[in-house]
Amino acid sequence: MLFTLAWASLAAVFSFSIAMVVWGRNGDGSLNF
């Protein structure tokens, strides 16, 4: 179970970072980080 939880959190962080890159390249000014 611990391995599954770690894998799920890793996948969530990875997909979130991909989303940040995509939104950043879209030039949307609503989110400024």
Swiss-Prot record:
Keyword DNA damage: no
Top-level taxon of origin: Bacteria
GO molecular function, one term: electron transporter, transferring electrons within cytochrome b6/f complex of photosystem II activity
Cited Pfam families: PetN (PF03742)
Biological-process GO terms, alphabetical: cytochrome complex assembly; photosynthesis
Disulfide bridge positions per record: none
One of the record's GO cellular component terms: plasma membrane-derived thylakoid membrane
UniProt-recorded name of the protein: Cytochrome b6-f complex subunit 8
SUPFAM superfamilies: PetN subunit of the cytochrome b6f complex
Subunit organization: The 4 large subunits of the cytochrome b6-f complex are cytochrome b6, subunit IV (17 kDa polypeptide, PetD), cytochrome f and the Rieske protein, while the 4 small subunits are PetG, PetL, PetM and PetN. The complex functions as a dimer.
Alphabetically ordered keywords of this record: Electron transport, Membrane, Photosynthesis, Thylakoid, Transmembrane, Transmembrane helix, Transport
Gene: petN
